[in-house]
Amino acid sequence: MALLHMAVTEPLDLGDGAGLSRIAKERLHVLHVNHLLRGEDADADQHFVQETCDSLGVPCTALRVDVAKFAQERDGNVEDVGRRVRYDAARELAQKLCIEQGVSRQKAKILTAHTADDRAETFMMNVMRGSGMSGLASIPRHRGLIYRPL
């Protein structure tokens, strides 16, 4: 939620080389994916996100996806499947919004709220897995449509 408040109220450095820039409020759209893993707590989170977006005047799309079921069907890890579901949904929504607004898809930016701690954790997980030199990297601040300004 911190990223949403920042995007609405102040300039952000997206790590794209453009420095600090404001995001036009009418271009913001929040995606919340409820993975259905935490019962009432997840439902409360979804409700909180939707209420916050309403109070800020930012449209919100909420999806409910049974990630545990997807993971079981695909013999996958729940975290990995959840991540793929979120990023796939974000890309699809970005494409849809670009088409609706008549904007080139290359203009789309998906902001995620990864923090420095998340990036450090990814680096340490790669070290513990025994990654070679190419694997000793953290989450990049920018990759494709994805930007991580925090």
Each predicted region: which residue ranges?
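Core alpha/beta nucleotide-donor-binding catalytic domains of modification enzymes
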Residues: M1-L150
